[in-house]
């Protein structure tokens, strides 16, 4: 009899716990405000799990995505290339007016090549995507060279002559660069002391008499120096010998090495601080877990970036991961996909129709959009492509079927704040309970379930089956049996 009673009690307890456990995952209907009459149901998703298979596939034509064909070849030869995106305002004048003065480019140098000395009428920051090399900076008072490698961030100050050597014998040197012109918004020029196949020397802007007097040499010698490279058909990226590489790299130092103590003017110290490289991977990732890592150099922490208000970032995502939805308060990110493909989603107040060739403000009189609609921007972004994330726009990235690597330049990064909308640490879970009820029309328990169920911060698995449930949330049936006397 006693055993029968224990069994009955045990079964009742098990049934009660199971019912409570199931109810805890239900949406409590009475805590929702009743829908307004005429309210329509949202778009349905295709059936399927969260692992990437079955996700709703959609491709929209919008100005935030720049495919490989968007690049123009500024220079190309068998030794390497320089490819530049058009001005962002040429693509969408109204949308990208805030970043009109910024240009994005890619540089690739084949093994054992040399990018000839030149300077820009612009400031530039590049990230080394692949390979190793040496960069040397030269002024009329000082010169300094550095070894550079994958993950290095290098500032090239406006007007400072520099040249780059790919010291590797097998691997190309690849750079992603953001450039900030100082003369004409969105337009900059390279200035070369020596002529090449497609570039004139800036000495061509002076008369022979002036040059001969300035250098104190005969005009015949001057002519050979200025025009020789052009006559033999060499480009701005040239093949060099192992001995030349050894000579060019002989005095290069690692960015981590301290400068030798010597007397120098304060302005020279400032310049040397600006052009000293640093490595993103030497910085602890600001976001990191099993599903992704995010390294970021902020202008408040690096003198090289401070006056440009630019951040440099490197993101690594594993297959089947999600960079949780978030937005940047002031920063617009220009993002380059270094490897893999991913699904990019973003909320925007601007509407774009499939096949639309004109964006708001392009070729038409600008009119303020007072629409309250939010539109979904969706793209599959792949290796070699660029996408833009404007300030204030909530977005997310899903690496569904492969690992994903991207680098980014954050424009107007000073005093910008990144706010996550989902994850263990998120904006919505911090709302006052009363504000939550008024805003979303749900009770506190439902809000807590909605905004605190994610067990990961920053990066999360796309499959719900991979979501780890903390031990404290798991039902302990053994404790029930213990209570019943088994």
UniProtKB/Swiss-Prot annotation:
UniProt cross-references to InterPro entries, sorted A to Z: Cupin_1, RmlC-like_jellyroll, RmlC_Cupin_sf, Seed_Storage-Functional
Family classification: Belongs to the 7S seed storage protein family.
SUPFAM superfamilies the record matches: RmlC-like cupins (SSF51182)
Chain intervals for the UniProt region annotation (Disordered): 34-60
Location of the Cupin type-1 domain: 64-223, 278-448
Tagged with keyword Glycoprotein: yes
GO biological process, one term: response to virus
Signal peptide (from-to): 1-22
Swiss-Prot/TrEMBL induction comment: (Microbial infection) Accumulates after 0.5 to 6 hours of tobacco mosaic virus (TMV) infection.
PANTHER family attached to this UniProt entry: OS03G0336100 PROTEIN-RELATED (PTHR31189), VICILIN C72 (PTHR31189:SF41)
The keyword Glycoprotein appears for this protein: yes
Residues glycosylated per entry: 168, 316, 455
Function: Seed storage protein. (Microbial infection) Involved in tobacco mosaic virus (TMV) replication. Required for endoplasmic reticulum (ER) aggregations mediated by TMV main replicase (P126) upon viral infection.
Expressed in which tissues: Predominantly expressed in the embryo and endosperm of developing seeds. Also present in seedlings.
Keywords, sorted A to Z: Glycoprotein, Signal
Loss of function: phenotype: (Microbial infection) Reduced tobacco mosaic virus (TMV) accumulation associated with altered endoplasmic reticulum (ER) transition in TMV-infected cells.
Protein name: Vicilin-like seed storage protein At3g22640
A Pfam family: Cupin_1
